[in-house]
Amino acid sequence: MPEPVKVLVTGAAGQIAYSLLYGIAKGDVFGKDQPLILVLLDITPMMTVLEGVVMELQDCALPLLKEVIATDKEDVAFKDLDVAILVGSMPRREGMERKDLLKANVKIFKSQGAALNKYSKKSVKVIVVGNPANTNCLTAMKSAPSIPKENFSCLTRLDHNRAKGQIALKLNVASDDVKNVIIWGNHSSTQYPDASHATVNLQGKDVGAFEAVKNDDWLKGEFITTVQQRGAAVIKARKLSSAMSAAKAICDHVRDIWFGTPDGQFVSMGVISDGNSYGIPEDLMYSFPLTIKNKTWKIVEGLPINDFSREKMDLTAKELHEEKETALEFLSCE
């Protein structure tokens, strides 16, 4: 059996983690023969709840799970990590300005970035889920200068999966028959879900999504807004934010980093924009279409971008730039 992989999940007493931990521990992410050490971090007031989560993990009697470490201390949590999944963040409270939310989260992710820098392996893969995910990821990256920038990514896979699901529902096909949708930009309502490079398998033949759907107005209108606003729609219906679907997306995201993407397919992740060929400013955590091989991602180059896409890609880049400026302001006065 290989050496155990050491995986941290923060916000471990929360509802996304509750759906996520079982998936990781039973081998959905790192494979069915990869032993694991799970490290669970949360804030001190949540430690009693976290004890209950640990009990349940023990009660699952999972063969791959070699050890569970629950802690409220960053120096314990970040020690010698292979993978860090940063789910915990300050949630937006009613009446809270986005700026206040950014400020609270800069503090958290600056501290966690510094802990990654100090205690984790330099090869650690860091996945940021807690919102605002792109800017939180940028903050952590900037606070961990000894870890390669490429090791940081943030979750837009939930949006990616939502986009696949909407096209599949529209055409009454399996979501697996829809490939190469793209989420560009920020994990916010300015994100751009782009179907113009997607294909759909109809009767055994791959057809462009626009040709398959035969409704350009829908793909350029309702499809985009549905994906952009899906998180809010789930909250409205369930009175809780997406947890099961978020956990599934995290599993997909991390599994693809670990094992790579299938040939001819790409996925969406927020990564550092340096050196991209799409005219997106450098030094932003921006969601691009990626292929992954040997645990290394590469932006898919050379996709033709029409005026409709250009405008939407630039709009979400502008929002990310503004978030970054605000975060850097807070970072420098922390």
Curated annotation (Swiss-Prot):
Q: What is its EC number?
A: 1.1.1.37
User: What name has this protein been given in UniProt?
Assistant: Malate dehydrogenase, cytoplasmic
User: Which top EC class is named for this enzyme in its record?
Assistant: oxidoreductase
Which gene produces this protein?
mdh1
What lineage, starting at the top, does this entry show? Eukaryota, Metazoa, Chordata, Craniata, Vertebrata
Q: Report quaternary structure and partners.
A: Homodimer.
The residues the entry assigns to the signal sequence are none
Q: Name one Pfam family in it.
A: Ldh_1_C
Q: Name one GO biological process term.
A: malate metabolic process
Q: Which organism is it from?
A: Xenopus tropicalis (Western clawed frog)
Residues annotated for NAD(+) binding in this entry: 11-17, 105, 112, 129-131
